[in-house]
Amino acid sequence: MNVVQRTPAPATDVTDLRAALETDAKSLFQIEPRMTVRVGVVARSRDEPGAVPVILDPVLSYLQDLLHDFHRSDRHAPGSALGTVRQYAQDADADLRLVCPLSGPATLEAARVAREAGLPIEAILRYNRQTHREILAPDDRISFDTALESPTLEGLLELDTISPQNSRMARRLAERSVIAHSDLVIYLGDAENPSNQEIGLALQEAKRSGMLVMSMCGPQRICLWEPDTLAVDPAEDGDWYSVVDPEGQQKLRHALARMLGLPETPPSTATPEPSVRTPWGALIGGLRSAWRAVFGPEGHGSSRSEESCLEDFYAEEARVGGNHCGFYTLRWLFTENRLPRWSRHVDYRLDANLIGRPDADGSGEAAAWIETIDHVRQHCGETFAEGFEHILRRRWIYADNLAIHYSNLYRTAYIKNFALSGVAVSIALLSIFLGGLTGLKAIAVVVELLVIRAIIRTFKAEKEGAWHQRWMHYRALAEALRPSRLPALLGNVSGQLALTPSVDPGSNWVAWYVRATFREVPLPSGKLDQDALRRVLKLASEEEIGEAAKDGKQGSGQIAFHTSNHRRSYHLDHNLHVWANRTLTLTIVAGVAFVALYLLYTFNDSKLWKKMISGYKPLATVLGGILPTYGAVFFGIRAVGDFRASAHQSERMVRQLERLKLMIEGEIQDPHLHRTQDIFALLSKTLADDQRVWAMIYAEREVTQGF
């Protein structure tokens, strides 16, 4: 299977980017992931290479054939686990890569086999290349030099943080890094009796994470580990199946298909038998169709299938801005620090994230991840820099842009419906003052019906467009992609990510897409020494975590976002609560005034009091209806927005991020790779927990008619 380049690569020059933003922004993004599988190979340093070609060559050939078959089926015969939508990119062939530590005869021979097969190779060395070469046997140095000069070597990561005196720790880090950067691990030894405890533990962890694990099970046989269906411990409850046998090959095919999110068996082509509808069933179906025609789809937007969700995602368009300004209008009206001016146009920050907004003097707003981009271009190699830009950064920008768009659509819809419901009630009550003017009353009724029609149309549009569901999905995707750039700099982005299951069955495509994207991310090249770790830790501290704005200095990162969101959400919640109480208070005042006038009229039967109470009665009726209605509008917007919960969550996140920032700043003094990996794992978990809480807050906040 030949590896081909995708066509064409999105523009990277600033001038080209700016021109594309104005004409065809979608062309800047490679959205569909490339079908990719990374095969990691680990072995003892002293393992003999004799059996490697006999075992590895047929396995790699079989994997190539499987991927070619999967990719051809996805292209020409849609019928995936996600429905009939094609999941993977069609402008590039499937990509099979070999990841190995080049640590001895066996892994060097594995690299030679992959090189002759034309497969891309990504190598992770336990030391810098010079030290690594010195620890090899004289005969192995020639193979090592040949591997480094190979045109198929696409990534070379040198773990230069541990001295050769601590060879055990260095070997363990290299092996764990290979496994973390792989989707399928082949151990060139007996996994039941591993050559050392570290490899055994690493393989156990790989089994438990759901990774495919293969091992030698004889002189010229290799087997696949298959956990039992009801396994309590996937690392212990299972069996080995030889991939030479038909049963083992079938299990490997099914396991690889599951990992890629593809169907394990071809889709059924049988024609379903036509259903017989009774007259009663036809009547019910007609009533449901009439209901949907007026009010839109029944139930919540989560009824959309994974197929339609993924297909819609691929068909989306990146947007520079929009006119759905309901939430921004709400902020302008009900926050203490108002926006500079009200504007109907909402900026989605597509150009700011992609290329920045520099001023004439060179200052201004920088592009998103600009510090990380500079680090990648200087220290991580051209292949990684290109993959980082097009696979991680631009897909995050795309997902973030869509999330902003649909959040504005959704928020504008529910704010608009609540506000219009108040307008409809106001029109009905104000018609009291029209007296006997029948024509004007008829006009008022028509206007009220038009307002109600606008409410129903907004409700129907939200249901049909699934604005709420798309916002939830795209925000979850963006929040999964953004923090992944940090472990990617360490070559530690795992394709085995498992997102928290959602109550929305249509959201499973998000986890599939994130895993497919992570498998595409190439290995960075260069030395990963203490200086490199300090740079990466500094990026995590300053760019991802950031700091709050103070002393006239603009804030940055997640701390600045959560600080601002806490303040804004608190003011929104508080002011909506205050105005709702004010309307109820005014209702009480209006009612008390009417009762007082009535009592004065009762005890002093004069024409003056009679005239006053007769004139005030319609106004009291109108105020008694309109004021509570707008109080309910304020409370409804406050309840659906749930600004209080959002403010409290942001406050908690600021405290957690500040603790992580202190931990990172302490690690910068004397960084170690394994501790840095643990810190990034903790940071990713903290951000994932925040996303989970946010999803719980807004998952059931669907748009209503406002009544």
Each model region followed by its residue ranges:
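Conserved non-transmembrane functional hotspots
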Residues: 265-585, 595-707
